[in-house]
């Protein structure tokens, strides 16, 4: 079991939005079909959302880890990949499934709608910069849309003062920004907006106290010392025998694990 290293955490709630064209493979459909059966067996539709989240997250235990699964199309599309996950897509997929009103084949489009609502600014896909690349930007936009409640400050958080500029200063790492200078300008504008906001984090010496306020299924964001970057990892809180663990897609473990 991996002990939790907590710096930021929050709880989400979601509603649906209109659907766009999306990429969905036969492998993903197989996973989704298995999930419909799992949802029926576990009566997920009868559970409140906060209890669905940890149950759905457990469904993905053992799913292989794979980074960079969203940048596989020339144009920005809501790519769906359920058979390979990184820490971000794991959280996205679990939440998108948790907020479905029903669990059957007819819910596929609603699932994609939820992905769009979680992944893109104002649930609109214009270009690469529509995607909420920075966790802090995602946090802000979800709150603005009244989809998320950030309890970090309430749990003893202090202001998180850091200049966010990783994408613009490392644009060579992002082919989309290299190909289109206008997108790089948009990213710089987004970074400027992020740096004008106030965010909070939980210092290491306050983690044990904060863990008492965490509930099973809450989302955890982990800050980073990397210059210009806000967070480096995220997952779900998993509570067991009074202790808090992280249920996440692990790059080191190469799978979804606790």
Q: What do the PLM-derived regions correspond to, one by one?
A:
Residues 197-204:
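Short, structured beta-strand/loop micro-motifs enriched in basic residues and often containing a Trp
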Residues 21-92:
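Cationic-aromatic interfacial patches
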Residues 29-40, 50, 54, 58, ...:
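Generic detector of well-ordered alpha-helical segments enriched in charged/polar residues
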Residues 205-258:
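Accessory, usually C-terminal, subdomains that scaffold auxiliary metal cofactors
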Residues 1-26:
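Bacterial Sec-dependent N-terminal signal peptides
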Residues 34-37, 48-51, 100, 201, ...:
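Mature, folded catalytic cores of secreted/periplasmic enzymes
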Residues 65-195, 215, 222, 239, ...:
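Acidic/His-rich structured neighborhood in mature extracellular/periplasmic domains
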């Amino acid at each position: 079991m991996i002990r939790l290293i907590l710096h930021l955490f929050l709880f989400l709630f979601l509603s649906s939005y209109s659907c766009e064209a999306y990429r969905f493979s036969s492998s993903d459909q197989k996973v989704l079909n298995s999930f419909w059966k799992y949802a029926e067996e576990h009566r997920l539709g009868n559970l409140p959302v906060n209890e669905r989240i940890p149950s759905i997250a457990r469904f993905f235990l053992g799913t292989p880890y794979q980074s960079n699964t969203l940048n596989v199309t020339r144009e920005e599309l809501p790519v769906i990949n359920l058979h390979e996950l990184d820490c971000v897509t794991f959280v996205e997929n679990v939440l998108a499934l948790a907020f479905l009103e029903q669990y059957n084949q007819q819910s596929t489009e609603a699932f994609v709608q939820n992905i769009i609502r979680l992944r893109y600014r104002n649930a609109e896909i214009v270009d690469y910069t529509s995607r909420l690349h920075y966790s802090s930007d995602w946090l802000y936009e979800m709150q603005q849309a009244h989809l998320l409640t950030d309890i970090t400050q309430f749990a003893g958080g202090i202001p998180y003062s850091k200049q966010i500029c990783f994408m613009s200063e490392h644009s060579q790492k992002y082919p989309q920004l290299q190909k289109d200078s206008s997108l790089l300008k948009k990213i710089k504008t987004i970074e400027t907006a992020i740096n004008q906001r106030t965010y909070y984090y939980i210092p290491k010496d306050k983690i044990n106290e904060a863990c008492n306020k965490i509930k099973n299924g809450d989302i955890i964001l982990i800050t980073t010392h990397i210059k210009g970057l806000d967070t480096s990892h995220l997952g779900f809180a998993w509570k067991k025998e009074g202790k808090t663990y992280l249920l996440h897609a692990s790059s080191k473990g190469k799978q979804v694990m606790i």
